[in-house]
């Protein structure tokens, strides 16, 4: 007999996991529903493209991925460690730009400011994944993509990316 792995919580408008096995470390068990990682998924309902007006209407639902308290702590710790390092890296690049290139052509300075911003955001994503892998568990993205219910929704036309006009 097969049991349901998720249940709909109409009050919070989300699908909560009933499975207790952690998807991220494959060893732990989840104790509280709030330890789960809730992934927003989207389905485009209507798209309007007129010459001067664009509009997208979509549905959104959060699906819970079972996660133990240890994996939740690792994911939160990775985020807390990554952002200051990425910020320091971006500020270092900006200091380098201001010190060395501000006297030169303004286009070069603007391009290097964008490079610093990209390095900050990209560095944050890279470091978060690095710290998570170093702890020996799946990243949030890999855990979400490996969930069977998420896969079912993706095959039915839902997406992990929010639609934009």
Identify the meaning behind each predicted range.
Residues 89-97:
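Hydrophobic, membrane-inserted alpha-helices
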């Amino acid at each position: 007999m097969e049991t349901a792995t998720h249940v709909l919580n109409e009050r919070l408008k989300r699908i909560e996991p009933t499975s207790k096995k952690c998807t991220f470390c494959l060893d732990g068990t989840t104790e509280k529903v709030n330890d789960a990682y809730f992934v927003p998924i989207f389905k485009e309902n209507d798209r309007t493209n007129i010459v001067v007006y664009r509009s997208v209407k979509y549905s959104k639902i959060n699906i819970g991925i079972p996660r133990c308290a240890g994996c939740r702590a690792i994911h939160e710790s990775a985020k807390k460690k990554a952002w200051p390092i990425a910020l320091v890296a971006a500020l270092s690049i900006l200091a380098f730009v201001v010190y060395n290139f501000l006297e030169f052509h303004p286009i070069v300075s603007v391009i290097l400011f964008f490079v610093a911003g990209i390095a900050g955001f990209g560095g944050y994503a890279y470091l978060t994944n690095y710290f998570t892998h170093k702890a020996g568990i799946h990243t949030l993205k890999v855990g979400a993509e490996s969930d069977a219910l998420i896969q079912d929704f993706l095959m039915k036309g839902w997406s992990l990316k929010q639609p934009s006009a």
